[in-house]
Amino acid sequence: MSPVIWLLLAGTMLLYVFMRWQTHLAESGREPLIDPRLFRNRQLTGGLTMFFAQFTVQAGVFFTVPLFLSVVLELSALQTGIRLIPLSIALLVAAAGIPKLWPRANPRRVVRWGLASMTIGILVLVAGLDPGANAGIVAVPMLLMGLGLGALASQLGAVTVSAVPDSQSAEVGGLQNTATNLGASLGTALIGSVLIATLSATIVAGIQSNPDVPAATKEQASTELASGVPFLSDSQLRVALNEASVSESTAQEIVDLNADARLEALRVALALAALLGLTALFFTGNIPRQAPAAQVPENP
């Protein structure tokens, strides 16, 4: 059995023991590191859930889009960063503009619009991933992603902080950081695993079904690729095939197959990110409809 399973079980058990001990401390009148009673606060748990969902989706997109730009299109790091600028600009505009222009906006509605914008942006990108796609296809999706992330950023911090008294703000800050870090870690791991699994399955299946690939190459590929296929650019793959003394015709077949498999893997991984964003919409019920008092400016 994979050691990952045992680590997950051990982590779950450790978390259970930790929470039981924190509950014991709270019930005995001592000060716990985290008061378990905080999780009975619907507004707080709603905000933390949205932070977790946001960073899960965000991390998955930030993992896959640079792969498309830097590996599939073989852009430099600088060129890749330039293509992501629309996201940064839109995020800044939305995060700063929404509280200023609509200080009494319904937080739940803003969060839902933010998640919807992120999801639509991802789906637009999925639809544009075809063999002839260029770097320009990421502009609109990144703009929509940025608007969505900015909308969430404009609301979630105030939602969580205003859910508890000032005396517990430090605990809430710790929980918020935990939710974001956990979401980012899980998003990268989940989306990355799905991407590599899809890439591996597609390439192996394509090699096995291709009559132009020699039987010896098929057998070697099945053995060597069983543990996963690296996400390689065309030039990287050609170098590896040349070093392996693969014939030019067979090498071209494999390069073409890898190109198709990369796009399929990216589409599946991004589709999963979109599904996670869509699912998060069903967990926004605990976000309040009224703006927290701290967000609403007092009348002069």
Segments predicted by a language model, with ranges:
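Transmembrane core module of solute transporters
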Residues: 3-6, 27-171, 187
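Membrane-embedded alpha-helical bundles that form the substrate/pore pathway
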Residues: 51-58, 177-184, 264
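Small-residue-rich alpha-helical segments with characteristic i,i+4
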Residues: 61, 67, 138-226, 285
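Membrane interfacial helix motifs at helix-loop boundaries and amphipathic/re-entrant anchors
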Residues: 1-4, 65-83, 124-138, 198-211, ...
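Transmembrane-helix exit segments and adjacent C-terminal regions of multi-pass membrane proteins
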Residues: 1, 22-24, 38, 43, ...
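Small-residue-rich packing faces within the transmembrane alpha-helices of Major Facilitator Superfamily
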Residues: 12-15, 92, 119-120, 126, ...
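Transmembrane helix-loop junctions in multipass membrane proteins, especially transporters and channels
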Residues: 19, 23-28, 100-104, 130-134, ...
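Hydrophobic core of alpha-helical transmembrane segments in multi-pass integral membrane proteins
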Residues: 8-20
